[in-house]
Every structure is written in structure tokens, then in C-alpha cells.
Amino acid sequence: MECDKVGDLLLTSTYAIAFTGAGISTASGIPDFRGPNGLWKKYSPELATIEYFKKDPKGFWEFYRLRMRGLFTALPNRAHYALAELEKMGLIRAIITQNIDGLHQLAGSRNVIELHGNMRKCYCVNCLKTYDSDTVLDKIDKEGLPPKCECGGVIRPDVVLFGEPVYNISSALEIAREADLVLAIGSSLTVYPANMIPLTVKEMGGKLIILNAEETPLDNIADIVVRERVEEFLPCVVDYIKSQTLHRSS
């Protein structure tokens, strides 16, 4: 079984990391971006550009507040909890994520590097005062759109919009160069520079395991490709590792 193979690779790895995309959160009720039912099938990606935010902050927030409310009702699924458990076991050193939903942290993962920010945080573009997103949504309900800081500046979500550089890419690539195994989970692996993370691990001689519903451009260089539902597959990996650990200690 692929589950056993992945478990064995994790057990023999000395520095394994996870790289996650929107596909890990679909079982939590959050749509991915580019899949058959993805967000960009329903909305124009232009709504998530820095140019649109600057041109029409009110229109931008009409879209983003709906997205925020959808994210805030979501809870971690079994895949998030499985990764948190693998981290507690010492088998996953870090999670590098493209996601902005904060579900890895809610599931208990501690070393999470967010490339695209976190929708649960906001800040003023003028004075840089920070806000939690619940406060901003309350402000919208009371004062209308766009939400404004006490200084008069427009508040924006602390996420990377199209047209902006990603966060933490240098530290993420540094981790990737150290890793000897990467689990690429729920990502189309088409977005640059984030897709350099799994590619870097492979180029440095590490193993690449891809868990994704759709084909990716890196499938042909992966050591293992899994098409199963990640919220079912990852708990299976955890159970296998526990059984092996129990067997070895008895």
C-alpha cells in the first residue's frame, strides 16, 4: 500500500517537511482555487489583486468579507490533525503552507511557515496598526465598507494579493535545502515561487511525495504520487507509523 510506503519513508527520514496547498482544506468546506469547483471558477482572480484593492477598496472588501466569513466557520479536518500528530512524533519538522486559513495552527501544528499570510489578521495600510479579522468584520458591520483605521487609513487583510511578493520565501527555501523528504499535499504546484519548495528538496537529492487530486507538473519527478483523499490517506499513514513503532518497541 502507498500508505505503508509513505510511512516507511517518514520513519527513515531525518528532516521531513510538509508543503500544503488549498486541497488540504477542501474537506473543511473551503474551496480550492483551480479545481473543478475552485474559487476562480466562481469569481474573477482580479478581485484578489493589489491593483484592484488600490483602485476599489470597497469592491475588494465586498468579495473578501464573504471569503473571510466562509473561512472562519471552517474547522481543521483529519488531514490537518494528522500533520500535527506527525510533528509531535518528531517526523515532520515544518509545514510550509500556501494557505491563509490558519487551520494548521488550530489543529495543533507549531512550526508553520505561511507564504501567503493569514486571513485571520489585518493591518492599516497607512499606520500599519494590526487588527484581528473578527474586529474588522465587526467594524464593517457597524461602519460600512471599506473598513478604516482610527488614523483614516484603509484596513486590508494580512495576505499576499496577486501582484505582491510572497512572505517568508527565503526561510522556506532554506528549510527546503535542509530537507531530505517533502510531502506536497493538496497543491497544484503551478504557482511560482511557492512551487520551488518541493522542487528544491528534489534537486538537493531528497524524496518528493505528491498527494493531490489532480495531476501536477512535478508528478514525473516524484518518488510517490497519491491520488487518494488526503483527509483519509494521512490518518492512514499515522496509524501505520504507530503500528510500526509499537511493533519495534515490543
Curated annotation (Swiss-Prot):
Keyword set includes Transferase: yes
Domain of life of the organism encoding this protein: Archaea
InterPro entries according to UniProt: DHS-like_NAD/FAD-binding_dom, NAD-dep_sirtuin_deacylases, Sirtuin, Sirtuin_cat_small_dom_sf, Sirtuin_class_U, Ssirtuin_cat_dom
Molecular-function GO term, any one: zinc ion binding
Pfam families associated with the record: SIR2 (PF02146)
Binding of Zn(2+), residues: C124, C127, C149, C151
Reported cofactor(s): Zn(2+)
Enzyme Commission number, as recorded: 2.3.1.286
Compartments reported by the entry: Cytoplasm
UniProt entry keywords in alphabetical sequence: Cytoplasm, Metal-binding, NAD, Transcription, Transcription regulation, Transferase, Zinc
Cofactor note: Binds 1 zinc ion per subunit.
Residues that, per the record, bind nicotinamide: F33, I100, D101
SUPFAM superfamilies: DHS-like NAD/FAD-binding domain
Binding residue positions for NAD(+): A22, T26, F33, R34, Q98, I100, D101, H116, S187, S188, N212, V230
Deacetylase sirtuin-type domain boundaries: 1-244
Cellular component GO terms, alphabetical: cytoplasm
Active site: H116
Reactions catalysed: N(6)-acetyl-L-lysyl-[protein] + NAD(+) + H2O = 2''-O-acetyl-ADP-D-ribose + nicotinamide + L-lysyl-[protein]
Function field: NAD-dependent protein deacetylase which modulates the activities of several enzymes which are inactive in their acetylated form. Deacetylates the N-terminal lysine residue of Alba, the major archaeal chromatin protein and that, in turn, increases Alba's DNA binding affinity, thereby repressing transcription.
Similarity comment: Belongs to the sirtuin family. Class U subfamily.
Protein name (Swiss-Prot/TrEMBL): NAD-dependent protein deacetylase
Gene name of the record: cobB
